[in-house]
């Protein structure tokens, strides 16, 4: 096996890797359900467009806006604090790295669905659903920032200075600015996550959007959506280092009260001692062979009838979306490049990409599902649009940083023979990195009816088979971590593992693509 991997690594190249993914995408397209099943899709799309151009601002619920910000601030803040604590021991302990990988491999929606069984639809459910995966993300990113920080200040410390004082006084002051900028950038991601949590009942903008979309009130939905874009667009104005304490305190005051403590403790006891215990083991004599034989049959049934078909459809959907995202990003990135877009075209292109990447793909798929009908097609379009805009934006920034000769060609020749060949390694780094993110998102689209792993998770929770739901969620996490590990192996084999792969924030608070520790976005 090891020899085969070494041989494969030697044969890998940009061309062979691209061809393999294209062939995989072709097989996935042939296998996927991409039909338009709605009776009158164009009529529904026209109604949606009419609503977008005539927003009803009187329908905006200010409380939902405040809740959206509050959930995001508290969830990201708690995740950053926990991630910082984990980052201090992240490089030393394999168990910590495995825990962080597990936390971030489970989507916020899955965390929320589980937490609801204990905490109900209270504020703590939304905050923890964001904080848990973000803690894993922050731990990894903060750990890499710590490892790559300047160590010169340590050399002037007195001999015998302890590890903790040395870190607090010599290293932390230099890292605080990086930590702060990354945390504030993550707040934008938290806002998108909070909106999506509203679709399963939490009192955010997403809850209002869900109601308006179901009723066909697209003008009201458009007004709320534009307010959300306003929150994201102005994030750098109201979310700064000096406003963070104010936002945290205000968020605590804004959120409604949750379940009484005694109810939470009772729910937690039931959840841990009954709900998630596999059905064959409940009340059984664990010293006899019968319950363990029944457990094996129970797990085998879940594996054959739910995990395998769900995982296959998740991989099919993610592979189609990955190829579509790659192609779309190659088309989009010239829209924001000085060498390709004209003076007035760049601002329009930049605004378009920012709006599309700020739109949660789950919400976009939800809307398209109502207009195109149930199939993989709405999910594919949503994943391709959102991730294609992200990668296109990053590629455009990289293209602007390239030095060109004075006699460089123009137009299509410049794109095909100079810009794209020089950026292709960076392009593959972005695509391979987004692979795991797309797969994680593909799994949760099952909640909308696409038969990915999330479809079976949602069904199990709806039927109160929480033991089955936990098995399916663990399987989803295992699939996500496997794809992530393979993606990292491919990037190392192609010698592109050191290239930047995420949106980050520079010292001025703007988006940057300079080489920074690899994070998750």
Language-model regions: role of each:
Residues 85-114, 331-367, 393, 397, ...:
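Cytoplasmic-entry segments and transmembrane alpha-helices of multi-pass inner-membrane transporters
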Residues 38, 47-51, 92, 105-112, ...:
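Transmembrane alpha-helices and adjacent helix-loop boundaries
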Residues 40-48, 201-213, 263, 270-272, ...:
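Short hydrophobic, aromatic-rich alpha-helical segments embedded in or entering the lipid bilayer
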Residues 72, 76-88, 109, 178, ...:
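Hydrophobic positions within alpha-helical transmembrane segments of bacterial inner-membrane proteins
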Residues 205-240, 453-489:
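Hydrophobic alpha-helical transmembrane segments of polytopic membrane proteins
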Residues 103-134, 353-384:
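Generic hydrophobic transmembrane alpha-helix motif, especially the helices
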Residues 1-73, 77, 81-85, 89-92, ...:
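N-terminal, non-cleaved signal-anchor transmembrane helix
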Residues 123-186, 190-193, 374-438, 485-488:
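Membrane-cytosol interface at the C-terminal ends of specific transmembrane alpha-helices
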């Amino acid at each position: 096996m090891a020899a085969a991997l070494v041989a494969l690594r030697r044969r890998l190249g940009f061309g062979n890797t691209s061809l393999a993914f294209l062939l995989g995408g072709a097989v996935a397209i042939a296998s996927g359900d991409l039909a338009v099943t709605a009776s009158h899709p164009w009529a529904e799309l026209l109604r949606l467009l009419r609503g977008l151009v005539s927003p009803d601002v009187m329908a905006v619920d200010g409380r939902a806006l405040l809740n959206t910000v509050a959930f995001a601030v508290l969830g990201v803040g708690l995740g950053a604090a926990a991630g910082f604590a984990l980052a201090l021991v992240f490089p030393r302990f394999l168990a910590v790295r495995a825990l962080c990988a597990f936390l971030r491999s489970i989507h916020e929606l899955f965390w929320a669905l589980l937490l609801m069984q204990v905490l109900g639809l209270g504020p703590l459910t939304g905050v923890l659903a964001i904080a848990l995966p973000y803690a894993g993300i922050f731990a990894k990113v903060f750990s890499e920032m710590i490892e790559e920080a300047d160590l010169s200040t340590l050399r002037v410390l007195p001999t015998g200075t302890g590890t903790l004082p040395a870190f607090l006084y010599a290293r932390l002051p230099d890292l605080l600015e990086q930590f702060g900028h990354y945390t504030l950038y993550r707040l934008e991601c938290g806002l998108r996550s909070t909106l999506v949590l509203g679709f399963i009942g939490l009192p955010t903008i997403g809850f209002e959007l869900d109601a308006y979309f179901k009723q066909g009130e697209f003008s009201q939905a458009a007004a709320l959506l534009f307010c959300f874009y306003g929150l994201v667009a102005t994030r750098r104005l109201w979310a700064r280092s000096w406003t963070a304490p104010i936002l945290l305190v205000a968020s605590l005051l804004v959120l409604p009260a949750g379940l009484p403590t005694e109810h939470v403790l009772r729910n937690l006891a039931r959840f841990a001692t009954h709900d998630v215990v596999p059905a064959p083991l409940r009340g059984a004599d664990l010293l006899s062979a019968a319950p363990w034989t029944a457990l094996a049959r129970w797990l085998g049934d879940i594996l054959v009838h739910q995990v395998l078909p769900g995982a296959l459809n998740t991989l099919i959907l993610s592979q189609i979306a990955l190829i579509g995202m790659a192609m779309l990003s190659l088309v989009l990135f010239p829209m924001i490049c000085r060498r390709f877009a004209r003076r007035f075209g760049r601002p329009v292109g930049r605004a378009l990409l920012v709006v599309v990447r700020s739109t949660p793909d789950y919400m976009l798929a939800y809307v398209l599902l109502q207009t195109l009908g149930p199939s993989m097609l709405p999910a594919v379009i949503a994943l391709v649009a959102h991730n294609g805009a992200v990668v296109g934006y990053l590629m455009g920034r990289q293209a602007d940083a390239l030095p060109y000769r004075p006699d460089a060609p123009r137009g299509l020749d410049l794109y095909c023979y100079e810009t794209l060949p020089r950026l292709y390694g960076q392009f593959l780094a972005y695509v391979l990195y987004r692979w795991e993110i797309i797969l994680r998102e593909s799994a949760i689209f099952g909640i909308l009816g696409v038969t990915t792993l999330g479809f079976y998770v949602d069904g199990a929770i709806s039927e109160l088979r929480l033991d089955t739901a936990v098995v399916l969620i663990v399987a989803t996490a295992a699939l996500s971590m496997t794809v992530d590990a393979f993606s990292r192996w491919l990037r190392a084999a192609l010698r592109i593992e050191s290239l930047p792969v995420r949106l980050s924030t520079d010292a001025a608070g703007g988006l940057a693509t300079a080489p920074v520790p690899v994070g998750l976005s």
